[in-house]
């Protein structure tokens, strides 16, 4: 087993939003939410001394042209420290895009599903 080449210093929900404009939209979305799509975007920003902020954004939305839509978004931020010997850009990309994501996914998924449940849309799984 290989040792991790990074350490998560901190992680938190940076932004979270659930919008259902009215009861008609809620009733419509409740029946059509299975058609919604989950988009994932990962960005990173070097801070200092091998410390990087990794933002993982989830957007759960209707791709159809329906007028009755609800939107659900969350940005989960992880602050990581990379080992000093990491110089290769491909290794750094793998850490940010794969390794960090695998590590944070259980918390990220739980927070996002809790938001959906608390917004009136239980029993959704990814």
Which residue ranges define each predicted feature?
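N-terminal intrinsically disordered, cationic/polar leader segments
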Residues: 1-126
């Amino acid at each position: 087993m290989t040792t991790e080449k990074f350490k998560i210093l901190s992680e938190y929900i940076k932004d979270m939003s659930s919008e259902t404009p009215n009861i008609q939209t809620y009733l419509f979305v409740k029946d059509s939410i299975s058609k919604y799509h989950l988009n994932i975007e990962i960005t990173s920003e070097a801070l200092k001394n091998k410390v990087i902020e990794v933002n993982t954004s989830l957007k759960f939305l209707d791709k159809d042209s329906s007028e009755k839509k609800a939107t659900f978004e969350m940005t989960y931020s992880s602050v990581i420290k990379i080992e000093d010997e990491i110089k290769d850009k491909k290794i750094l990309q793998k850490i940010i895009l794969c390794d960090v994501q695998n590590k944070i996914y259980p918390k990220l998924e739980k927070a996002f599903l809790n938001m959906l449940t608390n917004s009136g849309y239980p029993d959704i799984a990814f």
